Amino acid sequence: MDPKDRKKIQFSVPAPPSQLDPRQVEMIRRRRPTPALLFRVSEHSSPEEESSPHQRTSGEGHHPKSKRPNPCAYTPPSLKAVQRIAESHLQTISNLSENQASEEEDELGELRELGYPQEDDEEDEDEDEEEDEEEDSQAEVLKGSRGTAGQKLTSGQGLEGPWERPPPLDEPQRDGNSEDQGEGRATQSEPGEEPRHPTPPESGT
């Protein structure tokens, strides 16, 4: 086949308009404008775009601007706008923190007016009472221990009461048999052996 025949075959495909809705055709035309429409749009473009002519030449590859502005189109903010937005965000954050602090102070003030802080006072009083009770219990324990010690002493005194302690060896014995007891001890110890408990000379003899 000749190249001419190929071209004829490519361009001889008819697109019957009866199958397409005219509204759809308009939408397609708006989405993909013709080069003539691109040229018209570039003529009526803003002065900022006129300052850069290379955008006109490369406008065919990019999405062209239609005559009717798209309300959903996103325009990126400038640096100043971004700075303003950041400052406003920082201000709102600081205001929120201040408002929270003021609200907490107001709530505390309202609680104090209503008498809720008395709970803290009551807790302090309870703690003081618990400390006093602990001190009292410790004092009672000490008193009890002292009382038991006194009872032990008194019981010891009671036990020692009927039993008379033997007088020291240095002092003379009250009984008249002291001399006899001393002689008996001397006789019990043999003359060759030393007495286990040597008796010092009594002052009575």
Curated annotation (Swiss-Prot):
PTM remark: Phosphorylation of Thr-34 is required for activity.
Superkingdom, taxonomy of origin: Eukaryota
Modified residues (Phosphothreonine): 34, 75
InterPro entries in the cross-refs: PPP1R1A/B/C
GO biological process: behavioral response to cocaine; cellular response to cocaine; DNA-templated transcription; intracellular signal transduction; locomotory behavior; memory; negative regulation of female receptivity; response to amphetamine
Region (Disordered) location: 1-205
Similarity-based family: Belongs to the protein phosphatase inhibitor 1 family.
Protein name stated in the entry: Protein phosphatase 1 regulatory subunit 1B
Protein source organism: Rattus norvegicus (Rat)
Gene that encodes it: Ppp1r1b
